[in-house]
Amino acid sequence: LSICRKALTRYMPELVPTWERLGHLAGGNVRVARMLSLYCPAPYVVGCSQAVWTGSEPLLVRNYDYHPDAFEGVAVHTQWNDTRVMGVSDCLWGLLDGMNEHGLVAALAFGGRRDGGVGFGIPLILRYVLETCHTVDEAAAVLDRVPSHMSYNVLLTDRTGDHAVVAVAPDRSTTVERRAFCTNHQDGTGWARYLEVTRSFERERRLESLMGDPAMTSAELIRSFLKDPLYSKEHARGFGTLYTTVYRPRAGRMSCLWPDRSVDQDFDDYEPQEIEVETPDSPTDSQAESRPSESA
């Protein structure tokens, strides 16, 4: 526990009081506190497509592709450190994607590389970014400073329309590119079997085509995320699309989308609610064998 505390204090000191409060709420259990630090966690692999619309009203749209049994299925609205944040939760207090009241938006995608190292789970780093930063440049600086335990692509935008893809990894330097979209690989390389199964390059080509179309509208871009190849139906293999989110930083509005429904929330009128979304059955043993594994 002392190692986790030291790492949090060094890299994300503003989160330490909240971490301590959460540990207290959990009864002071040491194992729970260590888990909540997300320091050097077990590897986890997701598939995502995400893009920033840079038109008159900037927005970020993304799909989250993962195993339904490992998904918390919780969207949250918090104000833990004087900043209101809303997004989709992971690891109890981390975020898969989210936006703060200053108009900064961040979303993660696995970077397609198996190499692991010493660092934090990316959901907690995203939480920290949205708790402490106002702009894309500030967020990129934090992502460069705080070590990630695996490779991820983080897409950022803010209410000015500035945007960037920040590629983090435990074994090489962080890169920042002024690109408006990303999927699940870095530098055109990575874990070959995973990239094949998740169609990362195909999804990237589709995003490049959409973003390069001068007639494209934001509404059409969003609809494209509910269609093949960006929308994945590979739930039986653990990489199906579980939700689509759209963040509009100027309006302070978040939308969660599925093919048959949507839920809209905003900072000033966030309404807790519970909905039921049907996803295909979990993978069978034989289907799970077709997924890329750590030994693949």
Give names to the regions the model predicted:
Residues 1-31, 37-39, 54-296:
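C-terminal, well-structured catalytic/ligand-binding subdomain of enzymes
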Residues 41-52:
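Charged, often glycine-rich, active-site loop that binds/positions anionic groups
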